[in-house]
């Protein structure tokens, strides 16, 4: 059984999909006016982990993540850079996808852009106008009148807008100050505009997600549009509250059966955000740390809790990943990188565990999945993995040639890779991380000279070269197939 903390009900509850064996999951993607930061990374990793778990358990998952490419900040950026809004959006979408790939985040099944879904937005706004939930102001803006939605505030338990007045545009044009914009009329040469049935303008932020869910994901004849709507906890109010309201008013049903929200990444006690100027951009972090090391760190705190970024904690968490790769090195040749793992292969792996492994391995996978199915209890899951790594190493120390046991370990590692997105590199490449190509070539050259010295029985030179490399933090391992090396 899967349990999750539903943000609407404010408690952990059992998860039951709307339709058997299917899950429709929507995650709010980035507003593409700047590079992605570690807050974006964490949110993407969190819901990538949920998606992997659902897939592992056999669900057919349709995963949608949007790009907001119409926004005040994008317009401002385009003016600053003398570039079109389309150029700004395309550039940062490409940058975002590149960063996510480096972090091992699976691509969404559908990645709609706001600019590609304007007809659906206009259609929903027309429906809201026709039903009397929306009205047009004096400046051609169209607002949702929230007091007509008797369930407004049910998701966030909030009614009052707490943002600054800068977020409340044209307050004098509203019937009530908490009414929010569905459509923003064209304001002049520094604005952008699209044709619509209500004149030139552009959509408000909230209507974008509702319209894209209706087009790409929603069930049309169910009590709820989709199974799960997810995003950062900063989106709960007003964004998700407003999404829920306008969809409810337009369609007569709730937008989602369950709501999931992840916690912030904090730097010096403040939420990481572009507007605060404390963003640790992913592209900058990747210059220092490999994406898998960042992923391993960011998934290590329960998804609903705030993560206080600390490089000491990051380096400490890397030791956990080192231990995983060292066990992998004992059972898989160092140059072999994991292939893309399918569910059928996972089924075969688990079958092998039941058929050939010791009792400890039989219970590993079920214990791991049970922990993850409990509102993604990552602390318990990592403890289970740590126990498996330690137990496996202890057993192999005494029984280094037990092939059946090694096969079971391979299966365990493959399941960890599928579920957590960790351990997919070859051990050789993992233990050589952080070195540029020039340095690697210099190391390989010294190793070749050492091999030549050994062939000529010049053991003094061979030992000297080994010592030189060791002083540089490089350890050489001699095997029947030749010499390999890793960064200590």
UniProtKB/Swiss-Prot annotation:
Primary enzyme class: ligase
UniProt: Zn(2+) binding residues: 28, 209, 239, 243
Name of the protein described by the UniProt record: Cysteine--tRNA ligase
Main location: cytoplasm
Pfam family, one: tRNA-synt_1e
Location of the motif 'HIGH' region: 30-40
One term of GO molecular function: ATP binding
NCBIfam families: cysS (TIGR00435)
'KMSKS' region, short sequence motif: residues: 271-275
Keywords noted in UniProt: Aminoacyl-tRNA synthetase, ATP-binding, Cytoplasm, Ligase, Metal-binding, Nucleotide-binding, Protein biosynthesis, Zinc
Binding site for ATP: 274
GO biological process, alphabetically ordered: cysteinyl-tRNA aminoacylation
Entries under Gene3D superfamilies matching the protein: Cysteine-tRNA ligase, C-terminal anti-codon recognition domain, HUPs
A single GO cellular-component term on record: cytosol
Organism from which the protein derives: Helicobacter hepaticus (strain ATCC 51449 / 3B1)
Co-factor requirement: Zn(2+)
Domain of life: Bacteria
């Amino acid at each position: 059984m899967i349990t999750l903390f539903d943000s609407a009900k404010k408690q952990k509850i059992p998860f039951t999909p709307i339709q058997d064996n299917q899950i429709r999951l929507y995650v709010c993607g980035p507003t593409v006016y700047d590079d992605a930061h570690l807050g974006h990374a964490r949110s993407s990793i969190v819901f990538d982990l949920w998606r992997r778990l659902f897939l592992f358990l056999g669900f057919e998952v349709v995963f949608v993540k949007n790009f907001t490419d119409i926004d005040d900040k994008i317009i401002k950026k385009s003016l600053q850079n003398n570039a079109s809004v389309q150029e700004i959006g395309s550039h940062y979408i490409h940058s975002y996808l590149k960063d996510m790939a480096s972090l091992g985040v699976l691509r969404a099944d559908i990645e709609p852009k706001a600019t590609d879904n304007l007809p659906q937005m206009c259609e929903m706004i027309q429906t809201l106008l026709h039903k009397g939930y929306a009205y047009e102001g004096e400046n051609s803006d169209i607002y949702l009148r929230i007091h007509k939605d008797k369930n407004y505030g049910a998701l966030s338990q909030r009614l009052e807008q707490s943002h600054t007045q800068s977020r409340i545009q044209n307050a004098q044009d509203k019937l009530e100050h908490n009414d929010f914009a569905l459509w923003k009329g064209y304001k002049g040469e520094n604005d952008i505009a699209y044709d619509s049935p209500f004149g030139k303008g552009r959509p408000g932020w909230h209507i974008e997600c509702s319209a894209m869910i209706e087009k790409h994901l929603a069930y049309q004849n169910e009590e709820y549009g989709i199974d799960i709507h997810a995003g950062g906890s900063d989106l709960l109010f007003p964004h998700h509250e407003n999404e829920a309201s306008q969809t409810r008013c337009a369609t007569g049903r709730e937008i989602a059966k369950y709501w999931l929200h992840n916690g912030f990444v904090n730097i010096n006690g403040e939420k990481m955000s572009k507007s605060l100027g404390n963003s640790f951009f992913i592209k900058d972090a990747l210059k220092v740390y490999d994406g898998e090391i960042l992923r391993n760190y960011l998934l290590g705190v329960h998804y609903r809790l705030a993560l206080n970024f600390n490089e000491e904690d990051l380096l400490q968490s890397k030791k956990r990943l080192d231990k995983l790769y060292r066990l992998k090195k004992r059972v898989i040749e160092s140059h072999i990188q994991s292939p893309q793992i399918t569910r059928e292969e996972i089924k075969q792996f688990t079958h092998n565990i039941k058929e050939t492994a010791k009792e400890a391995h039989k219970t590993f996978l079920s214990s791991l999945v049970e922990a993850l199915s409990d509102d993604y209890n990552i602390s318990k899951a990592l403890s289970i993995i740590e126990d498996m790594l330690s137990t496996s190493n202890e057993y192999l120390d005494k029984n280094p040639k037990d092939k059946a046991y090694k096969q079971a370990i391979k299966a365990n590692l493959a399941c960890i890779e599928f579920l957590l997105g960790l351990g997919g590199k070859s051990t050789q490449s993992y233990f050589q991380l952080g070195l540029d190509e020039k340095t690697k070539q210099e190391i390989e050259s010294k190793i070749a000279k050492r091999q030549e010295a050994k062939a000529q029985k010049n053991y003094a030179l061979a030992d000297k070269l080994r010592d030189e490399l060791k002083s540089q933090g490089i350890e050489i391992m001699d095997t029947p197939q030749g010499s390999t090396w890793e960064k200590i």
